[in-house]
Amino acid sequence: KNMHQILDLALPAYDELFEEINLDGLVESKGILYIWNEKDLKSRELEIQIRKELGVKQQIVNQKEIHDLEPNIKRFYHGGVYYSYARHARNPKKILLKLFELFLKKGGNFIKQKIKNVEFDDEKPILKSDNESFFFDKIVITCGAFSKRFTDNLNEKIPLDTERGYHVHFKNCDHLLNRPVIFSNRGFGITPMEQGLRVVGTVEFGGLNNPLTKSRIKNLIDNAKYMLGDLPEHEDEWLGFRPTLPDFLPVMGPSKNYKNIFYCFGHHHLGWTLGPISGKI
């Protein structure tokens, strides 16, 4: 509910960026479908009502309507919600590379360095790497789950943690779904992409350094087959770090301790969604 205002700005911010790049089929506007296996809406009434009060366009769908939208899903479901206006990326990496090229074209400068800490000279921030120092008038710390190392260094006590989320791909299977589908009861989703079907899900508080938990990969594979039946051998096992705070709100704005340092991190499950509007900081 508290994220509604910034989420309302997400698609217009993307549209503004997309006016300047050739998407070439990299984004599809086919909506997103959430499904569940409860036989009534009682457990879903609160979230549906809150979205209704906020003016979110949502369509409650029954078994037949779900089957019409996604005929390849096994019929374990009893209902769901369809957000027809939603979009999804067919290849996020290609989109990011196009935006990166636009950044350089507009005069942006990219320097690849491993930054160790932030220091100051006459109240101006200095980014320190092993071998170099970079001087700025202002900086924005946007390092996702890795931002805490810098905020701790700046004596800014921010309770940032990481929700580890897992991913697997099933190659050449994207034709099985028309749009992203989230199975709410089991906490996972599947998106049709250029690389095939991307299956994502779970939340694991495992920090930034612990190894991948194999049982969670197996859980994703089992859930994908529960939804779609037989699938080929999976590939590309990996996990990502969702930067999250206890109140589930991102940190966006100036530091309390330093007038020329700004923060923009902690977008939990919505980093890709809120990237363009957050970038306006």
Regions found by a protein language model. Give the residues of each.
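C-terminal lid/capping helical subdomain adjacent to the catalytic/cofactor pocket in oxidative enzymes
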Residues: 5-6, 29, 60, 73, ...
